[in-house]
């Protein structure tokens, strides 16, 4: 029996390794072509490593950053991502705490309503949302954060609610006896306990908001505000020609922050998801 288990473990390791290579290969392909001189790679050379004649060094990265206004797009992406994730964490952690501790029909209905929002396809509401956002002048980087709060609330509340069900209420009752108000109980007692779920939720929401293209395109004023995915999409050279090498260089730059964030905090994702789903 142990031999069979070891064999299946080895088979699973091989399968997962192959899937990992399959997942990483497109990124490697983009990276190697971002180092080639623009116009030197075609369908027959796209899979080949750069040679001495086609190697461009960092020129595509420098050109891409200066050409597409990378710094302004980076600023908009940072503002939208940081603000949206902060709002999601603050509002949804308080909501999850409330729904767990206030056990009545209204809280149960609200919980079902929030979880139901997770299964509603974005495509069902995107045109109505775009028109409403334009009517209410929500087409700015600050106002789109409110929309992200609405769409990100389902997953966040689900995770916070599941985790809070495993937290003994006696801790909060002891704080209440000591004279703490509900706000003090949340920020001084509950908030520190939520750290694993808080970090994992922040990572998941950050990856979503940072890489999102469709919602900013529908809501934001494209002429004034462009996030990094939007800037990459609208990257054009002379006469509307798509410059693939600088575009690929910008794609690599755009994914670096998310890779660093994920590699730094990946252990918290598993802890938070397990705490929010299994314990709940």
Label every model-predicted segment.
Residues 2-280:
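A structural signal for multi-pass alpha-helical bundles of membrane permease subunits
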